[in-house]
């Protein structure tokens, strides 16, 4: 049976800008009856794999010892520890010790080295899942950058939003402009133009 898909979150150790040496992640397997209590923590250096290798009985004993209600509690604690960079791992021969600390009491788990035939498909699944997550993040980042850099399209033609509406005003005077009556003086509006002077007739007696 193929290994289950990677269940985020995960973390790399040591945290920060240094070169990573270990990857810590978790898997939740669903049983045939839909039970989700099959839960394991994993640590890998990309060559070897360590696992908690929980059985239903050992997981039940772990929950009773730490006062946990279910595997979901371990998953949420692991997520919180990853976000707070509060995960530590110690490798010892064929075993590893992982500690989850942070804002809650620390939880410590013993991990055993997974045999190579079983570890190989799990490491392959981890690599493919990480590659898929990276590709999805790159696509989302490219879409976000395109949205930010592309100007919003304006459906109204450029230059028309500031033009006055002149069509209905053509052939009519604008507001406050009075039409000149025939014969009205151009110099003194409102007064009729006078007739041209006829001069003085000196021959008239």
Swiss-Prot record:
XLM (motif): residue ranges: 191-205
Region (Mediates interaction with XRCC5/Ku80 and XRCC6/Ku70 and association with the non-homologous end joining core complex): 172-205
Biased segments, Polar residues type: 147-159
Modifications the protein undergoes after translation, according to the UniProt entry: Phosphorylation may inhibit interaction with the DNA-bound XRCC5/Ku80 and XRCC6/Ku70 heterodimer (Ku complex).
Sites bearing Phosphothreonine, chain numbering: 147
Residue span, PISA domain: 39-81
Compartment(s) of residence: Nucleus; Chromosome
InterPro entries: PAXX, PAXX_N
GO aspect biological process, one term: double-strand break repair via nonhomologous end joining
Gene deletion effect: No visible phenotype in normal conditions. Mice are viable, grow normally, are fertile and have normal lymphocyte development. They however show mild radiosensitivity. Mice lacking both Paxx and Nhej1/Xlf show embryonic lethality caused by severe defects in classical non-homologous end joining (NHEJ).
Region described as Disordered: spans on this chain: 147-205
Keywords carried by this UniProt record: Chromosome, DNA damage, DNA repair, Nucleus, Phosphoprotein
Gene Ontology terms for molecular function: DNA polymerase binding; molecular adaptor activity; protein homodimerization activity
Top-level division of the source organism's lineage: Eukaryota
Domain-level remarks: The N-terminus (residues 1-115) forms a head domain that is structurally related to those of XRCC4, XLF/NHEJ1, and SASS6.
Role: Non-essential DNA repair protein involved in DNA non-homologous end joining (NHEJ); participates in double-strand break (DSB) repair and V(D)J recombination. May act as a scaffold required for accumulation of the Ku heterodimer, composed of XRCC5/Ku80 and XRCC6/Ku70, at double-strand break sites and promote the assembly and/or stability of the NHEJ machinery. Involved in NHEJ by promoting the ligation of blunt-ended DNA ends. Together with NHEJ1/XLF, collaborates with DNA polymerase lambda (POLL) to promote joining of non-cohesive DNA ends.
Oligomer and partners: Homodimer. Interacts with the DNA-bound XRCC5/Ku80 and XRCC6/Ku70 heterodimer (Ku complex); the interaction is direct. Associated component of the non-homologous end joining (NHEJ) complex, composed of the core proteins PRKDC, LIG4, XRCC4, XRCC6/Ku70, XRCC5/Ku86 and NHEJ1/XLF. Interacts with POLL (DNA polymerase lambda); promoting POLL recruitment to double-strand breaks (DSBs) and stimulation of the end-filling activity of POLL.
PANTHER family registered for this protein in UniProt: PROTEIN PAXX
The protein's name in its UniProt record: Protein PAXX
Native source species: Mus musculus
Lineage: Eukaryota, Metazoa, Chordata, Craniata, Vertebrata
